[in-house]
C-alpha cells in the first residue's frame, strides 16, 4: 500500500525547501529531491565533514552529464539551451542544481530584492494586483531573519570593491551595498564560484536552515528520488510517482502536491504529466539574465583575489542623462578567483594546495560581473524531463545579441572599464576601447556559449488561465490540489537575483497552505511575526 501524506513537495531548493520548513509542523509532509542530501549538523564557520568533503572534492564531472544518454551530473541537471539565431544547431549547457538545498546550496549568496519597476511589471504582464512590495514585505523580513541576511562590515570588503565604490561615486554613479545570506563566513574567497557548495556551512541555504527545521517537525525527506509523474485523477492531483534506488514508487497526497523543481524542472514535470495539454502556457514566457564578466589587471600584487567576499556592491550602468539601464554590475565579482571551469583547464581538482596555488598566481586581477536583467526576448521550455529543449534566442540572426541586451552590455563594459582605469588598471577584457563591432561580437559569443542565469516565469502566476499557469498563490488553474512554488511562477522578469524573491513567495505560499489547505488558522503568519517583533 502506498504511503500517504497531507502534502508532497517535489524539490528541496529555495522554493520547496523554504515552504517545507514553514508547514511541516502543521501536517504530514513528504519532501522529494532528485539529488543527494549532504548530511551533517550545520556548523557555520566550520562545516560538517560530509559537506566539507563535497565542497572540496568537486570536479568538472559534477557539471557534465555522466554519459551521452544522460542529462545529469552528480549535483546538476544539464539541459541544452539554444540561444543563437545565427547558428540554430549550436547549444550551450544550462545547468540546474540537483541537490537538497537546490540553487540556494550553490549560489554566490548575494541577496537582492526586486525594484519598484519589477513589481509594476508583474501587474502589467499578468494582471496580478497583490504581488506588491507592501504585500511581500513581511515575507522578505521572515526569510531574511531565517537566513541571517546582512551587509558586511567594510573591514571585510575586498580591496577592489572599496576603491571601485569610491571612484564610481566620484563619477556620479549610485552604488548599493549588496546584502548576503551568510553566517560566520571566514572569507575564503570561494563564494565567487557559483556552483560550489560552501565548505564551511556559512552559506545559509535551505539545506542548512529550513530542511532541518522541517525534519525536526516530522517531515520525511527522500533524496535521490526523481519524480516521473504527477498522479492526476478526475482533474485532481492525488500524488506523485518517483524513482529511487532502482524502484518505482507512488506516494499519495491527501491535500496538496507541490512542484518546486525550478523554472526548468517544474514545467518539464508538468509536461511529462500532461498539464501542458490543458494549459499551453506551461513552459512559455521564459525570462533569464544573460551576463558577461570583465577582468582587469591592476598594478601590485596585494588585491587578494583568493580571499574575501567579492559581491560587496552593485550598481546599474548609467546613461549620459543619469538614467539607470537594466544592466546590473556586481563588483568586484568578475572571475578573480579560479572557477571550476578554469581549474579544469589547469587539470587540477577544486581542492587542496594545487587549487589555491592557481588562485594565487593571479594576484593583480580584479573584475566585475554584468547581468542584463530585462532582455527584449522571451524563451520557452519544451520536450520532456529526459529530453528537454530550452529556447532562449537572445542572439540575433546576424551573430550579435538582440539590440537592447547588447546596447546595455556595451554601455556597462565601457563604464566599468573607465572606473577600473581610474583605479590604475592597465588592461581589461573585454575592453571598452575596442572597436564597437569587435566588442559586440566578443560579448555575443560569450553569452551564447555560456548560457543565461536565473530562469524565471515558465509557469507564471496571473489572474487569467489564458495567460498564466497558476493563480496568485501558485495554485494551478487546471489541476485541483496542485501548486507550483519556485522561480517558475514569477510573473515577469526581475532586476535582481531571484533567490530572495523565491524565498519570499514561498513564505507567502506557506501562510496560504497553513491556513487554507491544512486548516491551521492559529499559526502565526509572517505579518503576525513582524508585528510581534515590533511590540517586543
Protein language model annotation of sequence segments:
Residues 108, 116, 122-229, 427-428, ...:
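Conserved redox-cofactor binding core of oxidoreductases
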Residues 139, 363-440:
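Helix-rich C-terminal "cap"/substrate-channel and partner-interaction subdomain
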Residues 416-421, 506-521:
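Internal hydrophobic alpha-helix adjacent to the cofactor/substrate pocket in enzyme cavities
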Residues 492-511:
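A conserved FAD-binding loop/helix module that cradles the flavin
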Amino acid at each position: 500500500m502506498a504511503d500517504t501524506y497531507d502534502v508532497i513537495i517535489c524539490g528541496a531548493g529555495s522554493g520547496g525547501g523554504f515552504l517545507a520548513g514553514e508547514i511541516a509542523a502543521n501536517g504530514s509532509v513528504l519532501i522529494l529531491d532528485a539529488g543527494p542530501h549532504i548530511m551533517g549538523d550545520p556548523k557555520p564557520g566550520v562545516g560538517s565533514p560530509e559537506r566539507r568533503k563535497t565542497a572540496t572534492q568537486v570536479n568538472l564531472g559534477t557539471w557534465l552529464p555522466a554519459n551521452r544518454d544522460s542529462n545529469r551530473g552528480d549535483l546538476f541537471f544539464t539541459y541544452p539551451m539554444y540561444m543563437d539565431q545565427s547558428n540554430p544547431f549550436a547549444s550551450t549547457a544550462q545547468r540546474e542544481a540537483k541537490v537538497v538545498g537546490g540553487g540556494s546550496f550553490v549560489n554566490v549568496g548575494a541577496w537582492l530584492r526586486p525594484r519598484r519597476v519589477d513589481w509594476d511589471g508583474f501587474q502589467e504582464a499578468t494582471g496580478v494586483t497583490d504581488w506588491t512590495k507592501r504585500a511581500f514585505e513581511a515575507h522578505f523580513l521572515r526569510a531574511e531573519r531565517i537566513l541571517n541576511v546582512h551587509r558586511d562590515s567594510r573591514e571585510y570588503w575586498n580591496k577592489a570593491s572599496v576603491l571601485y565604490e569610491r571612484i564610481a561615486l566620484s563619477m556620479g554613479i549610485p552604488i548599493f551595498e549588496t546584502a548576503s545570506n551568510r553566517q560566520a563566513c571566514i572569507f575564503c574567497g570561494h563564494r565567487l564560484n557559483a556552483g560550489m557548495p560552501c565548505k564551511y556551512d556559512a552559506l545559509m541555504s535551505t539545506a542548512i536552515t529550513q530542511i532541518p527545521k522541517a525534519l525536526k517537525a516530522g517531515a520525511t525527506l527522500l533524496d535521490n528520488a526523481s519524480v516521473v509523474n504527477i498522479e492526476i485523477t478526475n482533474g485532481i492531483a492525488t500524488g506523485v510517482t518517483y524513482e529511487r534506488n532502482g524502484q518505482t514508487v507512488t506516494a499519495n497526497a491527501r491535500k496538496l502536491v507541490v512542484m518546486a523543481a525550478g523554472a526548468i524542472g517544474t514545467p518539464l514535470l508538468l509536461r511529462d504529466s500532461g498539464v501542458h495539454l490543458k494549459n499551453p502556457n506551461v513552459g512559455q514566457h521564459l525570462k533569464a539574465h544573460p551576463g558577461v564578466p570583465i577582468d582587469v589587471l591592476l598594478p601590485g600584487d596585494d588585491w587578494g583575489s583568493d580571499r574575501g567576499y567579492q559581491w560587496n556592491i552593485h550598481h546599474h550602468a548609467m546613461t549620459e542623462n543619469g538614467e539607470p539601464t537594466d544592466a546590473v554590475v556586481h563588483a568586484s565579482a568578475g572571475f578573480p578567483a579560479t572557477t571550476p571551469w578554469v581549474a579544469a583547464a589547469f587539470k587540477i581538482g577544486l581542492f587542496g594546495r594545487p587549487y589555491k596555488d592557481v588562485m594565487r598566481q593571479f594576484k593583480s586581477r580584479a573584475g566585475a560581473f554584468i547581468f542584463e536583467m530585462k532582455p527584449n526576448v522571451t524563451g520557452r521550455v519544451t520536450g520532456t524531463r529526459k529530453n528537454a529543449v530550452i529556447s532562449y534566442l537572445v542572439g540575433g540572426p546576424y551573430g550579435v545579441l538582440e539590440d537592447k541586451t547588447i546596447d546595455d552590455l556595451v554601455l556597462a563594459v565601457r563604464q566599468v572599464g573607465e572606473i577600473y582605469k581610474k583605479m590604475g588598471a592597465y588592461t581589461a577584457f573585454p575592453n571598452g576601447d575596442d572597436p564597437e563591432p569587435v566588442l559586440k561580437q566578443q560579448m555575443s559569443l560569450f553569452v551564447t556559449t555560456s548560457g543565461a542565469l536565473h530562469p524565471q516565469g515558465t509557469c507564471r502566476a496571473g489572474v487569467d488561465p489564458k495567460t498564466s499557469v497558476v493563480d496568485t498563490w501558485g495554485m494551478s488553474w487546471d489541476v485541483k490540489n496542485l501548486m507550483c512554488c519556485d522561480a517558475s511562477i514569477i510573473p515577469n522578469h526581475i532586476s535582481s537575483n531571484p533567490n530572495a524573491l523565491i524565498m519570499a513567495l514561498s513564505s507567502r505560499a506557506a501562510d496560504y497552505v497553513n491556513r487554507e489547505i491544512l486548516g491551521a488558522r492559529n499559526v502565526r503568519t509572517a505579518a503576525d511575526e513582524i508585528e510581534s517583533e515590533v511590540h517586543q
